[in-house]
Amino acid sequence: NVYQYRKMLQCAMPNGGPFECCQTHDNCYGEAEKLKACTSTHSSPYFK
């Protein structure tokens, strides 16, 4: 649930929040997409 997710984020990132976590995650995928070895049939880690 959302409460447990928030507690997990507080444990891993005590001074951060869900928006910072999601931004870091998205930036990581953005950089990985630039690597030839990391390309796939999907242009995004999120299925549309």
Swiss-Prot record:
GO terms for cellular component: extracellular region. The keyword Repeat does not apply. Its cofactor is Ca(2+). Its EC number is 3.1.1.4. Ca(2+) binds at residue 26. Transmembrane segments: none annotated. It catalyses: a 1,2-diacyl-sn-glycero-3-phosphocholine + H2O = a 1-acyl-sn-glycero-3-phosphocholine + a fatty acid + H(+). Its main location: secreted. GO terms for molecular function: metal ion binding; phospholipase A2 activity; toxin activity. Binds 1 Ca(2+) ion. Expressed by the venom gland. It is an enzyme of class 3 (hydrolase). It is found in: Secreted. The active site is at residue 25. One of its GO terms (biological process) is arachidonate secretion. Keywords: Blood coagulation cascade inhibiting toxin, Calcium, Disulfide bond, Hemostasis impairing toxin, Hydrolase, Metal-binding, Platelet aggregation inhibiting toxin, Secreted, Toxin. Negative results: does not exert detectable effects on both the intrinsic and extrinsic pathways of the coagulation cascade (up to 50 nM). Does not hydrolyze either fibrinogen or thrombin. Does not have impact on already formed fibrin clot. Is not toxic to PC12 tumor cells (up to 15 uM), but evokes neurite outgrowth in these cells (1 uM). Has not effect on ADP-induced platelet aggregation. The active site (His-25) is not easily accessible for modification by 4-bromophenacyl bromide (BPB). Belongs to the phospholipase A2 family. Group I subfamily. D49 sub-subfamily. Monomer. Phospholipase A2 with weak enzymatic activity, which partially inhibits thrombin enzymatic activity (Ki=73 nM), completely inhibits thrombin-induced platelet aggregation and retards fibrin clot formation (IC(50)=0.2 nM). May exert this anticoagulant effect through a non-enzymatic mechanism. This is Phospholipase A2 TI-Nh. The lineage of its organism: Eukaryota, Metazoa, Chordata, Craniata, Vertebrata.
